Amino acid sequence: AVXHPGTXVSXAAXXXFIPL
């Protein structure tokens, strides 16, 4: 989740922590 590009977006989309 950290250092991954789009962490904030993934967290908002999945409501959790999805490092994609």
From Swiss-Prot:
The keyword Secreted applies. Its EC number is 1.11.1.13. The keyword Secreted applies. It comes from the Eukaryota. Disulfide bonds: none annotated. GO terms for molecular function: manganese peroxidase activity; metal ion binding. It is an enzyme of class 1 (oxidoreductase). One of its GO terms (cellular component) is extracellular region. One of its GO terms (biological process) is lignin catabolic process. Keywords: Hydrogen peroxide, Iron, Lignin degradation, Manganese, Metal-binding, Oxidoreductase, Peroxidase, Secreted. It is found in: Secreted. It catalyses: 2 Mn(2+) + H2O2 + 2 H(+) = 2 Mn(3+) + 2 H2O. Belongs to the peroxidase family. Ligninase subfamily. Catalyzes the oxidation of Mn(2+) to Mn(3+). The latter, acting as a diffusible redox mediator, is capable of oxidizing a variety of lignin compounds. This is Manganese peroxidase H5. It comes from Phanerodontia chrysosporium. The lineage of its organism: Eukaryota, Fungi, Dikarya, Basidiomycota, Agaricomycotina.
